[in-house]
């Protein structure tokens, strides 16, 4: 009995089922809390990925191991992270381990795809996974209809107003997923999985749903479909591979572009107050491209790279470094503090240095070259490259690969299309390696369980800590939960953010308070925390550093200048308050400021 159960869960098809759930569940899970709105989506993606790794317990896997050469990029990036860690560039060991666990997750998924393709075949896998994406697309379409009805004034039990449309509650992620669902719908139609009227109704529903995302990238996704379809149609004629189907797909992709425009026009004139359309956003921003926020972020990230070209500013440090750079004469004076460069390669350059984007570019070039060399222009290959094109476009404009659900999907798709791998046999008995795999899987289970418990604790104290509404009894439990999260999970940076918000600026344990707040500022640079940091520095007597932090806070939030100039000096010793104001006056090149005792 046990052997049959073990054989089932370690079979390739069962693994594929879990991968299908990884394609579906994270982006159809309507649970979003603070401070990490995507935690549960990322967590369920990691759980499904971990369950799919049970196939590595199979003896058959270890008899003929194939390692994707593309997957080595994740090892290369991990080495850079370790080098930064050893160099003392990373502010948190837990954050470092969390990043390394993401890279290990991607490495294993990439190689899992190679193994599953070897056993199940690309066509069977593509058909199976495309159905999960289409189901996810319809789930989002139904949810958007429900949201629209609620926003129009219809009372729906348990429904609350969300800032955006779509289950994932993030416009660009929503558009990405719906574009992948649309590509999968077209692929399944070409494989005769849908009748004509069901397909066109589905396409109309998906394009309408995409319009509700408001993402300008949707136009790029649709154009990429047409370009891929054109290239495959031309080559399919030469190779006599799915020629009729590709001609049909080309017509559909060309029709989809004007159809998408007509859908937006209809929505604009029927419900203008309930939706912000992609084309509307595109036209409203077309005359201000050079001054856009994204362009400013790219410029500042480039300057950070030039200042730290070899190892970057450190993984996860770009927010803190962009804050410190507000006073730099080499950066544009936009007052921007940001967590990501909104471009994969620029982000890698800024945080990891020049080696990371070079490794990534080489890995991508070799993967594309080998994939193209052995391409037979079938429908499955077109579906695969369409999904990767969507994620690629998104990665050049935002940061989807920093989320476990998109990272997992991307790594698996690269493994699915891998044509270049290293095959070797294990000299010793393969059964000896299975306990090691089991230990790794158990470690993953423990890690995910501890992170779930930690996030529940963090969410519990989120608002009481920010509002400073903790009672004496709650303070004891709050402190206990903080140390539990810090010591037994990888969620320390987020726990520190909650704990830092509850800290009262005073001289009690001041060095410890400063350490916690400074570490928290690497993760979340809010004005309230910066103000508290400056106040603690003033209380400690470090007036020069306090003045510098006050200046950066004012550059970040000019409208709150008066607030920080009034509040922070009150924490300095009474005889030195004017000294602090003189220092900040010198920093700001402002008229002399005077302290007035209330």
What are these regions (language model features)?
Residues 49, 223-229, 379-432:
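Transmembrane alpha-helices of multi-pass inner-membrane enzymes
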Residues 131-139, 241-269:
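Hydrophobic alpha-helical membrane-interfacial segments at the cytosolic entry of transmembrane helices
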Residues 170, 295-338, 345, 352-358:
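TM-adjacent membrane-interface loops and short helices in multi-pass inner/ER membrane proteins
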Residues 225, 249, 260-298, 456-469:
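Flexible juxtamembrane loops connecting transmembrane helices in multi-pass membrane enzymes
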């Amino acid at each position: 009995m046990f052997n049959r159960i073990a054989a089932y869960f370690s079979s390739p098809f069962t693994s594929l089922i879990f991968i299908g759930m990884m394609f579906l569940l994270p982006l159809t899970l309507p649970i979003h809390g603070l401070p990490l709105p995507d935690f549960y989506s990322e967590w369920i993606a990691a759980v499904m990925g971990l369950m799919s790794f049970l196939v590595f317990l199979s003896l058959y896997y270890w008899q003929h191991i194939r390692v994707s050469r593309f997957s080595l990029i994740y090892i290369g990036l991990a080495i850079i992270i370790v080098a930064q860690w050893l160099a003392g560039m990373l502010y948190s060991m837990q954050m470092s381990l969390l990043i390394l666990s993401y890279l290990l997750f991607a490495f294993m998924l990439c190689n899992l795809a190679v193994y599953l393709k070897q056993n199940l075949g690309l066509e069977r896998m593509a058909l199976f996974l495309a159905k999960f994406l289409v189901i996810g697309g319809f789930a989002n379409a139904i949810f958007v209809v429900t949201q629209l009805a609620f926003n129009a004034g219809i009372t729906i039990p348990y429904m609350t107003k969300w800032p955006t449309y779509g289950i994932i509650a993030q416009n660009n992620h929503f558009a990405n997923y719906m574009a992948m669902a649309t590509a999968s719908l077209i692929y399944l139609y070409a494989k005769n999985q849908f009748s004509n009227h069901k397909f066109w109704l589905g396409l109309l529903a998906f394009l309408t749903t995409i319009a509700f995302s408001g993402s300008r990238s949707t136009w790029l996704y649709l154009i990429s479909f047409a370009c891929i379809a054109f290239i495959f149609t031309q080559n399919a004629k030469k190779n006599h591979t799915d020629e009729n189907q590709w001609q049909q797909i080309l017509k559909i992709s060309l029709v989809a572009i004007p159809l998408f425009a007509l859908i937006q026009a209809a929505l604009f004139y029927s419900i203008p107050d309930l939706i912000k359309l992609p084309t509307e956003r595109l036209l409203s921003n077309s005359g201000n491209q050079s001054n856009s926020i994204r362009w400013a972020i790219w410029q500042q990230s480039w300057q950070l790279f030039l200042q730290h070209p070899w190892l970057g500013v450190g993984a996860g440090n770009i927010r803190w470094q962009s804050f410190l750079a507000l006073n730099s004469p080499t950066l544009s004076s936009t007052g921007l503090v940001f967590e990501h460069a909104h471009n994969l390669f620029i982000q890698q350059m800024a945080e990891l240095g020049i080696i990371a984007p070079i490794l990534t570019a080489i890995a991508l070039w070799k993967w594309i070259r080998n994939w193209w060399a052995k391409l037979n222009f079938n429908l499955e290959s077109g579906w695969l490259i369409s999904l990767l094109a969507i994620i690629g476009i998104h990665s050049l404009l935002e940061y989807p690969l920093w989320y476990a659900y998109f990272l997992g999907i991307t790594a698996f798709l690269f493994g699915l299309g891998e044509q270049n791998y290293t095959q070797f046999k294990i000299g010793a008995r393969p059964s000896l390696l299975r306990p090691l795999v089991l230990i790794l899987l158990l470690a993953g289970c423990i890690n995910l369980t501890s992170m779930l418990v930690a996030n529940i604790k963090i969410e519990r104290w989120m608002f009481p800590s920010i509002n400073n509404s903790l009672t004496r009894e709650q303070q004891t439990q709050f402190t206990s939960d903080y140390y539990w999260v810090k010591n037994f999970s990888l969620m320390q940076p987020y726990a520190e953010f909650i704990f830092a918000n509850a800290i009262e600026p005073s001289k009690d344990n001041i060095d410890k308070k400063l350490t916690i707040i400074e570490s928290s500022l690497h993760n979340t640079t809010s004005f309230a925390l910066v103000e508290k940091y400056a106040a603690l520095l003033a209380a400690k007597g470090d007036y020069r550093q306090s003045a510098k932090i006050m200046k950066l806070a004012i550059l970040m939030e000019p409208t709150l200048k008066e607030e920080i100039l009034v509040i922070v000096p009150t924490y300095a010793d009474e005889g030195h308050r004017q000294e602090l104001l003189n220092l900040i006056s010198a920093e700001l090149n402002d008229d002399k400021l005077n302290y007035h005792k209330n």
